[in-house]
Amino acid sequence: METKQALEKADIIFSDNAAKKVSTLIEEEKNENLHLRVYITGGGCSGFSYGFNFDETYKEGDSSVENNGVQLVVDPMSYQYLIGATVDYLEDLQGARFIIHNPNAKTTCGCGSSFSV
């Protein structure tokens, strides 16, 4: 049985820019069942790495936040490292990408894709 918990707005912030980009990508895929899953794995030069993928399912214990009609979903293990973080979408000279501003990260690598706590 699937259970999903709605996050308080302050738990993890899903920025308007990120939500709009996710909405655009879902429209391009023509699959309204998709949501953005954010997760943390071991690895990277600082110990932990962020990951993003599109998913159609919710897993036991997932938490989610909605913005612009789309869902951001986080598993229970990743959630503990993302409390207070902002998931954003940025387009600049380095390219276009989803990024996480994480107040729990003590150090980050130069590219910003890994961190330590």
UniProtKB/Swiss-Prot annotation:
* GO BP field: iron-sulfur cluster assembly
Provide this UniProt record's keywords sorted from A to Z.
Iron, Iron-sulfur, Metal-binding
Task: Return the cofactor note field.
Answer: Binds 1 iron-sulfur cluster per subunit.
Which residues are recorded as binding iron-sulfur cluster?
C45, C109, C111
Q: Does the keyword Iron apply?
A: yes
Entry GO MF terms: 2 iron, 2 sulfur cluster binding; 4 iron, 4 sulfur cluster binding; iron ion binding
Coiled-coil segments, which residues?
none
Instruction: Tell me its cofactors.
Output: iron-sulfur cluster
InterPro entries given for it?
FeS_biogenesis, FeS_cluster_insertion, FeS_cluster_insertion_CS, FeS_cluster_insertion_RrpA, HesB-like_dom_sf
Q: Which domain of life is it from?
A: Bacteria
Q: Which Pfam families does the entry link to?
A: Fe-S_biosyn
Kindly list the residue ranges recorded as spanning the membrane. none
Task: Note the HAMAP family from the entry.
Answer: Fe_S_insert_ErpA
Q: Provide the family line.
A: Belongs to the HesB/IscA family.
Q: What does this protein do?
A: Required for insertion of 4Fe-4S clusters for at least IspG.
Xref: PANTHER family: IRON-SULFUR CLUSTER ASSEMBLY 2 HOMOLOG, MITOCHONDRIAL
Q: How does it assemble?
A: Homodimer.
Q: Indicate what this protein is called per its UniProt record.
A: Iron-sulfur cluster insertion protein ErpA
